[in-house]
Curated annotation (Swiss-Prot):
PANTHER family: UPF0122 PROTEIN CBO2450/CLC_2298 (PTHR40083), UPF0122 PROTEIN YLXM (PTHR40083:SF1). InterPro entries: RNA_pol_sigma_r3/r4-like, UPF0122, UPF0122_fam_protein, WH-like_DNA-bd_sf. This is UPF0122 protein SAR1212. Belongs to the UPF0122 family. It holds the Pfam family UPF0122. Might take part in the signal recognition particle (SRP) pathway. This is inferred from the conservation of its genetic proximity to ftsY/ffh. May be a regulatory protein. It comes from the Bacteria.
Length: 110
């Protein structure tokens, strides 16, 4: 698996965590098996007795759908921003003024 594939898989895992409740059972099952369980398209197709192409199309469409949810809701983006702020806060625990600025940044994200 290349670096870009790994980054995409990691992103899809996060998007799946945030948006899985908005997906149908079928969409949820396919994404979970493909991205979380590392099943191949053929293995998923065999599991659900459908064609490999049907699985591919469903995963691609569902991936596009969760990306669209992310564009509108920005849950993953805000999660990443909060995580970066928390990391910076840990570095400045002895500086109350800086901590207060980070707290304001966190409040602004909400």
């Amino acid at each position: 698996m290349g670096q870009n594939d790994l980054v995409k898989t990691l992103r899809m895992n996060y998007l799946f965590d945030f948006y899985q409740s908005l997906l149908t059972n079928k969409q949820r099952n396919y994404l979970e098996l493909f991205y979380l369980e590392d099943y191949s398209l053929s293995e998923i197709a065999d599991t659900f007795n459908v064609s490999r192409q049907a699985v591919y199309d469903n995963i691609r469409r569902t991936g596009d759908l969760v990306e669209d949810y992310e564009k509108k809701l920005e849950l993953y983006q805000k999660f990443e921003q909060r995580r970066e702020i928390y990391d910076e806060m840990k570095k400045h625990l002895s500086n109350p003024e800086q901590i207060q600025r980070y707290i304001q940044q966190l409040e602004d994200l909400e």
